[in-house]
A protein has these predicted regions:
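Catalytic phosphate-donor-binding core of small-molecule kinases
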Residues: 2-37, 69-150, 157-254
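Short, well-ordered secondary-structure micro-motifs within conserved domains or adaptor modules
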Residues: 34-58
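Conserved acidic residues
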Residues: 40-42, 62, 149
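Redox-cofactor binding/interface segments in oxidoreductases and associated redox assembly factors
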Residues: 46, 66, 153
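A short, gly/pro- and small-residue-rich
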Residues: 54-71
Length: 254
């Protein structure tokens, strides 16, 4: 496809976004505007963490190209300097650019409200430093139970954030879901890398627990209420090819 035929959107409202829009025009592509009902693009540059999360939860027709995110994203200067290569990578292999499919999680609380997550899903006690008991049901191993302030389930995009701070590993695209206890009561509690589906529940009635999705509180969770977290969709994205290995953390791959 010729550059002039490409429909490219840049989502964001700061100076970085304007820089990218100028680069898209200079590269000869057609700059388009996306709305909640119109996402017909060949590529969408998303500027910043929040914008990228929203785009992944509400994917466009074409590939998402994250810019200015902590990981799995390009820097603004790199994206502008490699604009033609990024367009080329939409159709063929380009050195230093990887085309991936990123998992989007559906979070089913057993109520009519079904949520979507791009980065992570956490169950945490409503008040800080309050212990509850949680269980994790996996598809390929026995159920795990532990006492902690909470538990977080993260996609590769979110694995370097809250889950990593809680002791979970950073995983590359296609590496599965990270499951990490938050401030566990006992030492020696593992983090896990799971497949595409886990079920989390609260096993004690003492402390109120809230459901946090991509950093926002979405619901309260009652005792023994199963929260099903499952990959139900994958979104195409262009990201920088990894050049270094993440530092090792103890984990168990399922």
């Amino acid at each position: 496809m010729g550059e002039s035929q490409r429909r490219v959107a840049v989502v964001g409202d700061d100076d970085r976004s304007e820089t990218l829009r100028e680069a898209v025009r200079d590269a000869g592509a057609r700059l388009v505007t996306v709305t909640d009902t119109t996402t017909d693009t060949d590529a969408m540059f998303t500027v910043g963490e929040d914008v990228t999360r929203h785009a992944l939860r509400n994917p466009p027709a074409g590939a998402v190209i994250p810019v200015g995110t902590q990981r799995l994203g390009f820097g603004v200067e790199e994206a502008t300097n490699r604009m033609h290569q990024l367009f080329e990578a939409l159709d063929s292999s380009v050195e230093g650019i990887s085309r991936i499919t990123h998992p989007i999680l559906t979070v089913d609380t057993g109520t009519p409200s079904v949520h979507r997550a791009a980065a992570d899903v956490a169950l945490i006690t409503e008040k800080p430093a309050r212990i509850s008991e949680f269980s994790i049901r996996f598809t390929r191993r026995p159920t795990e139970s532990f006492r902690a302030d909470g538990v977080v389930v993260a996609t590769p995009f979110g694995s370097s954030e809250y889950a990593n701070a809680a002791g979970g590993p950073i995983v590359e695209p296609g590496g599965g879901l990270v499951v990490a206890p938050i401030a566990p009561f006992s030492t020696g509690i593992d983090a896990w890398v799971a497949a595409e589906h886990v079920t989390v529940s609260v096993e004690r009635e003492t402390e109120p627990v809230v459901l946090v999705i991509d950093g926002a509180i979405r619901d309260t969770v009652g005792p023994y209420q199963p929260i099903d977290i499952e990959t139900t969709e994958r979104v195409e994205a262009l990201v920088p090819t990894a050049t270094t290995e993440p530092r090792a953390r103890r984990s168990e791959t399922l």
